[in-house]
């Protein structure tokens, strides 16, 4: 589609009370994991989306949810829609217990598809 935009939405749990640096690190983990998933997937469509996203400047938006249930819902919807998505659990080395779900990423993918899942969320 000509002129189509691509982006990645990163969703971070606010209910955990993570410090700014911790939240930023979790967002980065989610972003990177989604890209690694695409590179390892062998799915040509996802690879094309990744390349277009890269060429367009790697647009990202960081959004918030207030609960684990909301985070799981975002991730599940992305997977159901066939979009690349990651789900991050903390290693437990600093502020959180090991295995605590902290963040997810949807995309990179066409913005219109990402927005179907994350369009109602607020900025982090």
UniProtKB/Swiss-Prot annotation:
Catalysed reactions, semicolon-separated: an N-acyl-L-alpha-aminoacyl-tRNA + H2O = an N-acyl-L-amino acid + a tRNA + H(+)
Listed GO MF terms: peptidyl-tRNA hydrolase activity
EC number: 3.1.1.29
GO cellular component, one term: cytosol
Organism superkingdom: Archaea
Family matches, as Gene3D superfamilies: Bit1 (3.40.1490.10)
Keywords: Cytoplasm, Hydrolase
Pfam family, one: PTH2
SUPFAM superfamilies hit by this protein: Peptidyl-tRNA hydrolase II
Principal subcellular localisation of the protein: cytoplasm
Protein location: Cytoplasm
InterPro entries, A to Z: Pep_tRNA_hydro_II_dom_sf, Pept_tRNA_hydro_arch, PTH2
Hydrolase as UniProt keyword: yes
GO biological process: translation
Family: Belongs to the PTH2 family.
HAMAP family: Pept_tRNA_hydro_arch (MF_00628)
Role summary: The natural substrate for this enzyme may be peptidyl-tRNAs which drop off the ribosome during protein synthesis.
Protein name in UniProt: Peptidyl-tRNA hydrolase
């Amino acid at each position: 589609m000509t002129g189509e935009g691509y982006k990645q939405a990163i969703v971070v749990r606010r209910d955990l009370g993570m410090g700014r640096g911790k939240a930023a690190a979790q967002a980065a983990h989610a972003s990177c994991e989604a890209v690694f998933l695409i590179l390892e997937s062998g799915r040509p469509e996802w690879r094309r989306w990744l390349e277009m996203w890269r060429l367009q400047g790697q647009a990202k938006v960081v959004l918030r949810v207030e609960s684990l249930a909301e985070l799981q819902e975002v991730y599940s919807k992305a997977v159901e829609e066939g979009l690349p998505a990651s789900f991050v659990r903390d290693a437990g080395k600093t502020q959180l217990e090991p295995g605590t779900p902290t963040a997810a990423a949807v995309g990179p993918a066409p913005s219109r598809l990402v927005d179907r899942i994350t369009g109602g969320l607020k900025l982090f």
